[in-house]
């Protein structure tokens, strides 16, 4: 490759999580995690939610499927932890400093997908 190349700009990746029921997942993320419901495919097999700079797609899958893990940075980890606990999120690992130096907690959705919410 000779000479300078123009590089386009990319944004954050958007995960697509496997779920049994897209509408149920959207409702859970809205009520327990503070996301806004975005769109739903007319067939109901794919949909989205968003919050701040995070967007998540859901795709209906039949079990068994492999749940996924994603890391989400929280600028104010204490406030985020308190907010999600108060809203009924399923926190499966409490807020603590991990051996690798991050303060983090783990949230699990209704389909077993997990989010490691962390800060430096």
Where are these regions (language model features)?
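Vicinal oxygen chelate
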Residues: 12-20, 48-50, 61-87, 103-108
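Conserved active-site tyrosine of GNAT-family acetyltransferases
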Residues: 25-30, 84, 109-112
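Core segments of cupin and vicinal oxygen chelate
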Residues: 10, 16-55
């Amino acid at each position: 490759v000779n000479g300078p190349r123009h590089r386009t700009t990319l944004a954050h990746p958007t995960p697509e999580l496997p779920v049994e029921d897209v509408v149920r997942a959207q409702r859970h993320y809205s009520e327990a995690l503070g996301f806004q419901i975005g769109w739903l495919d007319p067939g109901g097999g794919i949909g989205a939610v968003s919050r701040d700079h995070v967007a998540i797609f859901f795709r209906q899958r039949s079990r068994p499927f492999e749940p996924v893990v994603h890391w989400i940075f929280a600028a104010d980890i204490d406030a985020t932890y308190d907010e999600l606990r108060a809203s009924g999120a399923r926190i499966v690992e409490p807020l603590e400093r991990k051996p690798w130096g991050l303060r983090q907690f783990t949230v699990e959705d209704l389909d077993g997908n997990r989010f490691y919410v962390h800060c430096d």
